[in-house]
Structures are given as C-alpha cells and as structure tokens.
C-alpha cells in the first residue's frame, strides 16, 4: 500500500466523542452512532416514520425460469389506514425452504435482474420495487409517501431507503424468507438509498450500494478518480453540485454545506459535522459491500476508498473487521451481470461460508 492510501487526516476519526475523549468499546460506539445517525438525519437525509404496518395483496403469480421460480406482483399498502401503496415484483425459488431476500430499488419500471437464474439457483429471493412510486424524481412533485407522513422532513433518498424497509416489513411475514438474511442493494441514486436503508434498518444483514458516489459510499471532502486525488468537480460529483441539481433528494438546508455556484468546487463541505465514512460505519457490525467502477470518475472511486478505510476502525472495534468490503472492477457506471455476480458471491460467502474473499482490492487498482 502506497503512502497516498494512508488514512486521510481530513476524514476525522470516528472513534472519538464530541468532547474529544476516545471511544474504546462497543457501548461507547453505539452511543456515538446514535449521535451520528441524528446528525446525518438533521443535516442531509431527514427523518423517516417508525411505522411497520403493511398489508400485501397479491396481484398476480406465475411460474418463471421454466418452473424453477415463481414471479409475483404484490401491492404493498402502507401509511395511515393503509391507504397508500406501491408495487413489489418478487421472484423466488419454486421449492420449499426459507431463502435470503435481496431488496432492490429500481428505476421506473425497469424490473429485472441479469443474474436472476443464477440467484434463484443459489437460493435467493429477489424483491424489486419502483422507488418513484414512493417519490417521483422531480424537484417540485410531492408524492404518496410525503402525503402519508406530512410531519417528516425527509428527502427522496431517505424515502426510497424507507421503501426497502417497507418491503422488508412485508417479506418478514412470508414463509419463504429467511428473516435473518436481508440484503439491500441499488445502483447510483438507488445505491445511495440502499446505503441509507442499511444504516438505519438493523434488519438488513448485507448493505450493497453499487456506484453510489456522492451522498452514498463516496466522500464529500476528497474527490478523485482511479489515478488518485484531483479535487475536480467537473470529473467527480461534489456536494454543491448534487445539492444544486437534485435538491429534492435531501433535507432542506443540506445545500449550505456545498458550493452552489458552478463548477461547484469543494470547500464548504468542511463545515459538515460528518463525512460518508460515518454513514458507512452506521452499518457496522453488519456487512457492507460496495461495488465501484474504476472508470466511473463521477462516483469518486478514490474518495470511496478513503471512506472505506476510515470506517474500518469501527468494524474492527465491533469484532466485524471482515464485514467492511469494497470491490473495484474495470468499467463505468452500471449495475450489470458482473456486479450481480460479485454481490451473489459476497452473500454466499457471508451467509453460507462459500468461496474465498477476492474483494477489498482498491490498493491494487487505484493510483
């Protein structure tokens, strides 16, 4: 490992209290984690309702994959009097047993998984939902989740993350689901939502953001591509740009921590009382697995590496050092067959002890 990958001093140590005293045990971290969770809600994501009531109504069910799977469309009702709803598309093995369930937030009506046959053969449920049925990805459009919970100050990322939790609320009641093995994944803005879901929902055993970048598994304070740090907001997405272009993704006020004038160069981020290693650390001791494209400069692969490193001491303190993982691959901004293969391999290893770890390869790939 070269010097460029040593812990970056701009990413403050997580194992310290607000008064500067060190955190030396799990109890101390759990108290500090509650503080970080509240900070991230207050400054970036907004708060979500604590409401696990759902009702599922099966709209259709049919065989799939030549009878090896069942494909269901379920309308999931939520909110006061269960008057609001969204659709879940669920593919599950057509054989007896309880299986890990992967919740996946999709772009509009883009249902499907390029490794569906492989996932079913390995014994996974794939549960997909269209996140825009919860909140349309537009600046001025309020949608069902906002109407259902008008007291919440959440932005779209937190609403979409909450969608994972509502889907899990339904899946917990199904006799084909192993309720100790939920996985939340998504790509790009959906990856940000998956990471937020894993940070705030302890039922999620594996959190798997894919190419999630700024506001996800990336870094606010340090920008860089596969060659290292460059601080170039025209190549890597900065806080200022994402807050200017997508203000509806965040709690109101988040924009104060970014440079809102083009080209949105870094600077005000240093006033933010956390960086994204704190969000990652909220997943601990459960497993975190991110997949990053080396040519996806916009998602800040270098900053992602730094926040991965900076979160590691928390996982170590909790006796879960092996659960903080990142996989770098060649290529750009995608969630394709290769990425699904990495995710399924990781889950096989984490849940069933199959295979050997081949991830955490950033030091070999970057710089």
Task: Report each predicted region and the residues it spans.
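Alpha/beta-hydrolase-fold serine-hydrolase catalytic core, especially in secreted/extracellular enzymes
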Residues: 1-85, 92-97, 202, 251-252, ...
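Cap/lid segment of the alpha/beta-hydrolase catalytic domain
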Residues: 97, 103-173, 213-225
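Loop/turn elements at helix/coil->beta-strand transitions in domains of secreted/extracellular proteins
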Residues: 98-102, 122-126, 178-181, 202-206, ...
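Flexible loop/turn segments at secondary-structure boundaries
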Residues: 110-112, 134-137, 191-194, 214-219, ...
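Mobile cap/lid helix-loop segments that gate and shape the active-site cleft of serine hydrolases
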Residues: 211-279, 300-308, 316-320
């Amino acid at each position: 490992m070269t010097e460029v990958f040593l812990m970056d001093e701009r990413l403050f140590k997580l194992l310290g209290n607000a008064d500067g005293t060190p955190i030396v045990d799990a109890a101390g971290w759990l108290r500090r984690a509650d503080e970080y969770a509240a900070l991230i809600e207050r400054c970036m994501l907004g708060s979500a309702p604590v409401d696990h009531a759902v009702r599922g109504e099966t709209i259709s069910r049919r065989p799939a994959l030549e009878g090896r799977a069942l494909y269901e469309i379920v309308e999931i009702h939520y909110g006061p009097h269960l008057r609001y709803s969204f659709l879940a598309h669920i593919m599950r093995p057509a054989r007896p047993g309880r299986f890990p369930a992967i919740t996946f937030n999709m772009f509009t009506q883009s249902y499907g998984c390029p490794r569906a046959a492989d996932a079913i053969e390995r014994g996974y449920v794939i549960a997909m939902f269209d996140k825009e049925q919860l909140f349309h990805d537009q600046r001025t459009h309020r949608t069902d989740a906002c109407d259902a919970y008008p007291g919440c100050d959440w932005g779209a990322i937190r609403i979409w993350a909450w969608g994972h939790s509502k889907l899990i609320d339904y899946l917990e009641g199904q006799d084909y689901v192993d309720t100790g093995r939920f996985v939340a994944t998504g790509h790009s803005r959906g990856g940000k939502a998956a990471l937020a879901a894993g940070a705030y929902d302890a039922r999620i055993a594996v959190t798997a953001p894919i190419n999630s970048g700024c506001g996800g598994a990336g870094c606010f304070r340090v920008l860089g591509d596969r060659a290292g740090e460059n601080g170039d907001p025209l190549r890597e997405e900065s806080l200022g740009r994402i807050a200017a272009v997508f203000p509806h993704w965040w709690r109101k006020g988040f924009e104060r921590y970014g440079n809102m004038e083009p080209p949105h160069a870094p600077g005000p981020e240093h006033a933010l009382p956390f960086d994204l290693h704190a969000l990652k650390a909220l997943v601990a001791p459960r497993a975190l697995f991110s997949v990053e494209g080396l040519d996806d400069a916009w998602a800040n692969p270098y900053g992602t590496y730094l926040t991965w490193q900076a979160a590691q001491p928390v996982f170590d303190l909790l006796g879960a050092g092996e659960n903080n993982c990142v996989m770098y691959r060649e290529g750009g901004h995608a969630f394709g067959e290769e990425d699904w293969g990495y995710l399924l391999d990781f889950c096989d290893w984490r849940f069933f002890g199959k295979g050997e770890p081949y991830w955490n390869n950033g030091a070999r790939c970057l710089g």
